[in-house]
From Swiss-Prot:
Start-end of Gly residues biased regions: 1-12
GO biological process: actin cytoskeleton organization; actin filament polymerization; actin nucleation; axon midline choice point recognition; brain development; cellular response to histamine; cytoskeleton organization; ephrin receptor signaling pathway
A GO molecular-function annotation: actin binding
GO cellular component, one term: ruffle membrane
Name listed for the protein in its UniProt record: Protein diaphanous homolog 1
Recorded family membership: Belongs to the formin homology family. Diaphanous subfamily.
Lineage of producing organism: Eukaryota, Metazoa, Chordata, Craniata, Vertebrata
Compositionally biased tracts (Pro residues): 594-628, 645-742
Organism: Rattus norvegicus (Rat)
Length: 1265
């Protein structure tokens, strides 16, 4: 039998070389080897030293020397005490430390033994060596560690291999660490070789003992790894972890349980780091070898029917893979992959199992998942705030799915979104529900992906519906608030209108009082005057009464005296009566007629003959007829008011003498027609004031027609001449400009056709039967072409055929269906003649005007007479603003309409546009009528545009005067400004210009991080919070800033002018000749209402100007120099800047707070990380000296109890907050950098910027976590 000391041989030569000595230089008492005991003791001490130092020396992969492996030294029966007496105290201490390690004592128990005396230590070492030698001789008398290695390499199979493995497992569990070290890397390599062979053979043919042998090897590995030496040796192998992963076979539950536990223990090892990633790599390699999902064996184990221990082991391995990872993305990715394989449904079944170990693992999984979910949600929320642009987000998503398997699914999602019901109320609810569903899918409550193999998704619909109901209520409240705001504006407008009306009534009442008071004063004065006059009259009456009485008395006396005198004078008067001459007759009595005075001389200077004596009763005698051959002398002109006697016609052959011109006021006498053969003499022009000259008589046959004379300036136009007599030459045509010029005579004046370049031939002239719609292209003429261009080579006539032209005529005919139908009804030769008739030529309108008018009429599809009736009736139900505007724009000029109205008899021969002109030409005063109708249609809109502007400025003026908080802000600004300007020329100010408020941000702080505006905003926040309410009190300042007082005045003046024009048109409008003409009736009422509206607007505008002027006096500025728009624009800008300063102050404080919390969180996270590391090292410290045993048992116990996974929730939450804070800071900095880059480059690359923010934020959050 080989003694125990022989088991220390493997690898010793290699280790001795590393220490700088050869194996032959071992301690010995002599070179002859005579003292066998001392040699054995020295040999034993060297082996113990080598065993002690083996943990700190990396095992080489080369196999030890076989000769050395087979050699062994026997302790024999040497007395141990005698042997220890020959070694030094230092060597005893080395053996004592090795004894403590083999005894598997912890540090607390080792410390008291180290404090013992050297004599006691020597005795203890002696007893331990003696006991160990006896036990080893008893236990390993049959089989040593090297023998196990030889047997494993001998190719045992089936039952023999199973027996060997069971014996090896017992030896590994019962022997001390030194025995395990002797078994070492060679024994481990032998076990792994057998395990690999069994795995490979199992894939081909599986024997009865293969699974049992594999399981027994896993148990041997567990026993081998129950100390730090075994774990390190296992980790140094290349395929050890992979073989453990391959051993996870759900078909062999017990073996899979042990393999999963071993892998779980390896995942939570503190050193080396990232052991869980090595296990994941091994699982990935196995999945690639077997072409399955890497977590599929774990899912199969969790779905196994009976073995609860297997389910616990698989879930324990899942927790061990996820929990140690520091990166949040890594943990979420692993959970997502597991959920995608169906873990979510399996978890529901596992929660129904009543098992303490299962409950521990489920709690660990749920708690860690919830924390990761909140971490991820917080990080994504911060990043999402920077991604509020639809185009950028869509482009990012499109780039991520482009040219991948997800692209058709993304397209399908977009297509389904197009199917959302197009309802104003329902569409937002659809999108809310879709958003919540997507959020719960991609951000599962456990931070994992759903099971994509099952369409069943567990979504909290009830919670979503409740939230949607609440959001709907909020939206309804917001809509109601908006409606109330509109009502408030309307009430405010009505209040201003009532104030203006009330002020007007007050002014009218005061004016009426003043008028009545004036009338009263006038009546009082008149009454006083009447009373005075009455008194004067009474006095005069009394005076006159006395005089009358006196005169009456004198009259009586005179009568008496006359009576007496008359009696005395009777006789003398009778005798002298015959000598008195006869008195002339009174006017109006009959008597001799006094001859009239002679008439005035004629214009030629001839003296007229004396008039004959008048006949009785004043009857005039007509003049005698002229003598034969004598000159026809006209009678003398009649006096004013007498009846004109026409002269007799001249005798044949006599020369016609024109009558003298009539005197002013007389009726013009038409001249007689000229005699045959005589030259027609034009009549003289009438004298000023006389009536128009009648048209000249028609020329006699054979005479030459003389054109009528032109009318005198200011006189009426001449009527058209009568038609000529038969046989007489025609009347010469009118001069150019008075009508359509006649066509040139055929056959005369046609120039020769020019020769076309490049061999071009003139294009064929087509004559369609009806006019077609004409394409509006840019025509090329021959001079525009070049020799090599395309158009010189075209031969379009090869496509010419009658069928093509017929189709074109049918499809693009410019005539309406009605006219075509009428033509179809006509039969025989008339139908053919109509079809061959040429296109109707324009007679009055030019082609452009006619075309524009035709296009306009084509958009209405109304008969012309109906359009006329609508305009006459002023039917606002049919008339629109655009229609009237186009009518005014396209309507021909009045002269053209007058000319078209004269062609009424030729209506059917006119073009459509001219037919419309004929119909509309019958409407009296058409253009003024259309302008008035247009103004009526636009009036309400004008009022609605002007009134809100007046109300906004008026309300803004009142708000500024009443706002106490704004006044307080001005006071604070004045205080701060005077303090800052102390010692300068601007110190001691009593006030400042309002425009200075916008310049507050120009004054920066010393550190350039704050402005005076930010300081005032922060001052108001801390000490005067009520002042922050002033923006709400100036609600109408924004609307007032958009009002131009100049434009407002112009609009009012324009409205006044338009109302006056309409009123004048209505007054001057002729009497209606058509019963449908309602223009005057409707416009009269409109003018009255419009005038009232205008007066109201004018008063409101006057009130606005008064308030603004008072505001200028209040804030000390000149309203004439500072317009309404400029003043309120400054206030509006200051209001916005103040609100922005408040937000920036809040953001700055939040940033400082985040930085402070991030710093504290970082320090705390580092502290927690160190504590966590220490806790993990408490399980096992792989870097500590010594060969600690029971390591695997401790790890498995920590995994089972959940102690290996426990961590305080506080650090994770703090880390999340810290990560969010740092993410926000980084995102803001990157945004600023992007903004600067964008301002310089003008065209930033949006997708790259967003990706950079995501990557940097993700990296930073991972570091912070």
């Amino acid at each position: 039998m080989e003694p125990s000391g022989g088991g220390l041989g493997p690898g010793r030569g290699t280790r001795d070389k590393k220490k700088g000595r050869s194996p032959d230089e071992l301690p010995a008492t002599g070179g002859d080897g005579g003292k066998h005991k001392k040699f054995t003791l020295k040999r034993l001490m060297a082996d113990e030293l080598e065993r002690f130092t083996s943990m700190r020396i990396k095992k080489e992969k080369e196999k030890p020397n076989s000769a050395h492996r087979n050699s062994s030294a026997s302790y024999g029966d040497d007395p141990t005490a005698q042997s220890l007496q020959d070694i030094s105290d230092d060597q005893v201490l080395v053996l004592f430390e090795q004894m403590l390690v083999d005894m598997n004592l912890n540090e607390e128990k080792q410390q008291p033994l180290r404090e013992k005396d050297i004599v006691i230590k020597r005795e203890m070492v002696s007893q331990y060596l003696h006991t160990s030698k006896a036990g080893m001789n008893q236990k390993e008398s049959s089989r040593s560690a090297m023998m196990y290695i030889q047997e494993l390499r001998s190719g045992l199979r089936d039952m023999h291999l199973l027996s060997c493995l069971e014996s090896l497992r017992v030896s590994l569990n019962n022997n001390p660490v030194s025995w395990v070290q002797t078994f070492g890397a060679e024994g481990l390599a032998s076990l792994l070789d057998i395990l690999k062979r069994l795995h490979d053979e199992k894939e081909e043919t599986s024997g009865n003992y293969d699974s049992r042998n594999q399981h027994e090897i896993i148990r041997c590995l567990k026993a081998f790894m129950n100390n730090k030496f075994g774990i390190k040796t296992m980790l140094e192998t290349e395929e050890g972890i992979l073989l453990l992963v391959r051993a996870m076979d759900p078909a062999v539950p017990n073996m899979m349980i042990d393999a999963a536990k071993l892998l779980s223990a390896l995942c939570i090892l503190p050193q080396p780091e990232d052991m869980n990633e090595r296990v994941l790599e091994a699982m990935t390699e196995r999945a690639e070898m077997e072409e399955v999902e890497r977590f599929q064996p774990l899912l199969d184990g969790l779905k196994s029917g009976t073995s609860i221990a297997l389910k616990v082991g698989c879930l324990q391995l899942i927790n061990a893979l996820i929990t140690p990872a520091e990166e949040l993305d890594f943990r979420v990715h692993i959970r997502s992959e597991l959920m995608r394989l169906g873990l979510h449904q399996v978890l529901q079944e596992l929660r129904e199992i009543d098992n303490d170990d299962m409950r521990v693992q489920l709690n660990v999984f749920d708690e860690q998942g919830d924390e990761d979910f909140f971490d991820l949600k917080g990080r994504l929320d911060d990043i999402r705030m920077e991604m509020d642009d639809f185009g950028e987000v869509f482009q990012i998503i499109l780039n991520t799915v482009k040219d991948s398997k997800a692209e058709p699914h993304f397209l399908s999602i977009l297509q389904h979104l197009l199917l959302v019901r197009n309802d104003y109320e329902a569409r937002p609810q659809y999108y809310k529900l879709i958003e919540e569903c997507v959020s719960q899918i991609v951000l599962h409550k456990n931070g994992t992906d759903p099971d994509f193999k099952c369409r069943h998704l567990q979504i909290d619909i009830e919670g979503l519906v409740d939230q949607m109901i609440d959001k709907t209520k909020v939206e309804k409240s917001e809509a109601k608030a908006t409606e109330l705001e509109k009502k408030l504006d309307s009430e405010l407008t009505a209040r201003h209108e009532l104030q203006v009306e009330m002020k007007k009534m007050e002014n009218d009442f005061e004016q009426k009082l003043q008028d009545l008071q004036g009338e009263k004063d006038a009546l009082d004065s008149e009454k006083q005057q009447i009373t005075t006059q009455k008194q004067d009259l009474e006095a005069e009456v009394s005076k006159l009464t006395g005089e009358v009485a006196k005169l009456s008395k004198e009259l009586e006396d005179a009568k008496k005296e006359m009576a007496s005198l008359s009696a005395v004078a009777v006789a003398p008067s009778v005798s002298s009566s015959a000598a008195v001459p006869q008195a002339p007759p009174l006017p109006g009595t009959s008597g001799t007629v006094i001859p009239p005075p002679p008439p005035p001389p004629l214009p030629g200077g001839a003296v007229p003959p004396p008039p004959p004596p008048p006949l009785p009763a004043g009857t005039g005698i007509p003049p005698p007829p002229p003598l034969p051959g004598g000159a026809c002398i006209s009678s003398s002109p009649q006096l004013f008011g007498s009846t004109a006697i026409p002269p007799p016609p001249p005798l044949p052959g006599a020369t016609a003498i024109p009558p003298p011109p009539p005197l002013p006021g007389d009726t013009a006498i038409p001249p007689p027609p000229p005699l045959p053969g005589x030259t027609a003499i034009p009549p003289p022009p009438p004298l000023p004031g006389a009536t128009g000259v009648p048209p000249p008589p028609p020329p006699l046959p054979g005479s030459v027609g003389v054109p009528p004379p032109p009318p005198l300036p200011g006189g009426p136009g001449l009527p058209p001449p009568p038609p000529p007599f038969p046989g007489a030459p025609g009347i010469p045509p009118p001069p150019p400009g008075m009508g359509v010029p006649p066509p040139p005579p055929f056959g005369f004046g046609i120039p020769a056709a020019p020769v076309l370049p490049f061999g071009l031939t003139p294009k064929k002239v087509y004559k369609p039967e009806v006019q077609l719609r004409r394409p509006n292209w840019s025509k090329f003429v021959a001079e525009d072409l070049s020799q090599d261009c395309f158009w010189t080579k075209v031969k379009e006539d090869r496509f010419e055929n009658n069928e093509l032209f017929a189709k074109l005529t049918l499809a693009f005919s410019a005539q309406t269906k009605t006219s075509l139908a009428k033509k179809d009804q006509e039969g025989g030769e008339e139908k053919k003649s109509v079809q061959k008739k040429k296109v109707k030529e324009l007679k009055v309108l030019d082609s452009k005007t006619a075309q524009n008018l035709s296009i306009f009429l084509g958009s209405f599809r109304m008969p012309y007479q109906e359009i006329k009736n609508v305009i006459l009736e002023v039917n606002e139900a049919v008339l629109t603003e655009s229609m009237i505007q186009n009518l005014i724009k396209q309507m021909p000029e009045p002269e053209q309409l007058k000319m078209l109205s004269e062609l009424k008899e030729e209506y059917d021969d006119l073009a459509e546009s001219e037919q419309f002109g004929v119909v509309m030409g019958t409407v009296p005063r058409l253009r003024p009528r259309l302008n008035a109708i247009l103004f009526k249609l636009q009036f309400s809109e004008q009022v609605e545009n002007i009134k809100p502007e007046i109300v906004s400025v008026t309300a803004a003026c009142e708000e500024l005067r009443k706002s106490e908080n704004f006044s307080s802000l001005l006071e604070l600004t004045l205080l701060v400004g005077n303090y800052m300007n102390a010692g300068s020329r601007n110190a001691g100010a009593f006030g400042f210009n309002i425009s200075f408020l916008c310049k507050l941000r120009d004054t920066k702080s010393a550190d350039q991080k704050m402005t005076l505006l930010h300081f005032l905003a922060e001052l108001c926040e801390t000490d005067h919070p009520d002042v922050l309410k002033f923006p709400d009190e100036l609600a109408h300042v924004e609307k007032a800033s958009r009002v131009s007082a100049e434009n407002l005045q112009k609009n009012l003046d324009q409205m006044k002018k338009q109302i006056a024009d309409v009123e004048r048109d209505v007054q001057n409008f002729p009497a209606a000749t058509d019963e449908k003409d309602k223009f005057v009736e409707k416009m009269t009422s409109f003018v009255k209402d419009a005038q009232e509206q205008y007066n109201k607007l004018r008063m409101m505008h006057s009130n606005m100007e008064t308030l603004y002027k008072e505001l200028g006096d209040y804030f000390v500025f000149d309203p004439k120099k500072l317009s309404v728009e400029e003043f309120f624009m400054d206030l509006h800008n200051f209001r916005n800047m103040f609100l922005q300063a408040v937000k920036e102050n809040q953001k700055r404080r939040e940033t400082e707070e985040k930085m402070r919390r991030a710093k504290l969180a970082k320090e705390k996270a580092e502290k927690e990380r160190l504590e966590k590391q220490q806790k993990r090292e408490q399980l096992i410290d792989m870097n500590a000296e010594g060969d600690e045993t029971g390591v695997m048992d401790s790890l498995l116990e920590a995994l089972q109890s959940g102690a290996a996974f426990r961590r305080k929730r506080g650090p994770r939450q703090v880390n999340r907050k810290a990560g969010c804070a740092v993410t926000s800071l980084l995102a803001s900095e990157l945004t600023k950098d992007d903004a600067v880059a964008a301002s310089s480059a003008k065209v930033p690359k949006k997708s790259e910027g967003v990706t950079t923010i995501l990557e940097e934020a993700k990296e930073l959050v991972g570091r912070a976590s």
